[in-house]
Amino acid sequence: YKTGVWPISLEIAGARMTLNQDGSVGLMLGATEIGQGADTVFSQMTAEVLNMDISDIHIQTVQDTDVTPFDTGAYASRQSFVTGTVVKDCANLLKEKILAYAKELLPEETRKLRLDHGWIMAGKDPAISLGNLALESYYSLGNSSVITAEVSEQVKKNTIATGCCFAEVEVDIKLGKIKILHIINVHDSGKLINPKLAEMQVQGGMSMGMGYGLSEQLILDEKTGRPLNGTLLDYKLMTMMDTPDIKADFVELDDPIGPFGNKALGEPPAIPGAPAIRNAVLHATGVAFNENPLTPQRLIDGFMKAGLI
């Protein structure tokens, strides 16, 4: 699965960061959090570059296009890759500005300065706390300069995420029912920024994939084109009662193109589930179904044509 849409279409993202008065960092993005854990991952990325605790990264969680930098959106499994690239570059720029200001405050210090969990370190020794440096940057009569960074980039790169799904099913031929006994999804999504969120992303995607394979079908009126099952009562989503124990695993291969060695994990988990179930039914019964979902009606029709009923 390709990460993002470049070079077919535009990929652009923006980030803005501010060193707050208490030494924490404010992060503002155009990228939207829609439940996939993006805000957590962006905060982790910022904390990683600045060598800070994630609790000191304050992200604006409700994006407002009147004030936030521009981002092309939450789609195509792109955010941790495309927006993540810009977050990394913006955090590096902020770090450069912080250390440059620290150098002005400590002109006698000859050792290399670095950030270390709320402190500006000179070699192995703490030189000034980030909080005190921030106060100086806001209120110094001689050198007041609020430290901010903003980056907007067109990201002209891409990489490929891979994955596979294994399913074991039990088929009741006479009733046209499929029971999923075991299912596991394995992905190479590069370096996992947040393994727990990654696992939850896979579980959600697999649940969607099982729905595509077994129950989800939009039925349209042939004359008007109107949906005939446009409610959650009639459009059959998988529920907890229908979902087996879902297992997720990863092959963590650091990707040299990703900002932190990472690549796509948004949509890939939803893709292989339905084909894996279909192939398991083929293996169990010898009948090849080439249309989803595998509803009882469709299964019984196929089994009757194959002479199994």
Give the location of each predicted region.
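Flexible, small-/acidic-enriched active-site or ligand-binding loops
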Residues: 41
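Gly/Ser-rich, acidic/histidine-flanked active-site/gating loops
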Residues: 32
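Internal nucleotide-binding/catalytic subdomain
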Residues: 20-22
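Short, aliphatic-rich beta-strand segments
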Residues: 24-29, 180-182
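C-terminal catalytic domains of large/alpha subunits in multi-subunit enzymes
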Residues: 44-309
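Accessory "access/gating" subregions that flank catalytic or transport cores
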Residues: 1-18, 237-240
